[in-house]
């Protein structure tokens, strides 16, 4: 049944992309990327990931002038993550930059919006990134500016110039990093869009030549009573198929796309009881008010009920297996998950992601 589902969606996507040509050949080695936060309570198993993005570093922009950047949280946590390379020398670790500010010695002084507006500040930031990579033996940089032309976390934004300047920033980063370092970004499920005051989001077509791959955040695409990370959903605001189709129509190679996997249930976006980590889900299964691992056949996703009402959707080993076959059938570059510490003590979802990426689907 899974194979029939995957093949049918594959045909639908292929048809929708005409006249863009045939699907790219599958890369031999797919990426299994874990986001690991500075505040997390566990480390990834370096033997069941290929890449780790350490989250986060933040910009220090004072009165619209870029000064430097620093890691969020304690450096000791970052050192622990970097030490994982001793257990797996092939492991790639990148530093992810956020638009938010959390360090006590910092404040919002313009952020990415102001820094990227200046050619001199862009180049200084790029040079600082290269120096940091060399100092720590990092493998690359990931930009998680969410999002150009928008502000929902108190950060500065300028819809008139942010999207254009984002492209210039990625260009300068690639020129500084060269081809020896990874450059990626956290991608929204849609391309740039026009607004009354300018544009929002990333100009994907303009940015893709500069990056090695895109971490497409195919989660939080809706909330209860709809599905947040469905492969296909006729009721959700967006779904995985729509996201991949959006990128493919812009000419993004399939092997540059990583599919995002949430390690949590999305209930709402109201700032109250918004998410439930997978490790909490495991504990809540003994609560008689909850029902977990219910299955929607169209969306190919599990969901939960609370007192017989739809509570939220999430991913589990079953849905990750379906997405794994889908990733291989389409020739995507792999997957990413947010985030490592939300998994249970047995690392159930991390192991499922590794199985989804490494399984031989040709047998």
Predicted regions, residues:
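Glycan-recognition patch characteristic of GH18 chitinases/ENGases
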Residues: 25-133, 232
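Glycan-binding loop/region signatures in secreted carbohydrate-active enzymes
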Residues: 96-99, 103-110, 256-326, 346, ...
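Short, well-ordered coil/turn segments that N-cap beta-strands
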Residues: 29-30, 89-93, 137-139, 179-181, ...
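Bacterial N-terminal signal peptides
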Residues: 8-19
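Conserved, mostly hydrophobic/aromatic
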Residues: 52, 95, 143, 173, ...
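Stable alpha-helical elements in mature extracytoplasmic
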Residues: 45-48, 77-81, 108-111, 121, ...
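Substrate-binding surface in catalytic domains of secreted glycosidases
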Residues: 33, 60-76, 148-288
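Positively charged n-region of N-terminal signal peptides that target proteins for export
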Residues: 1-5
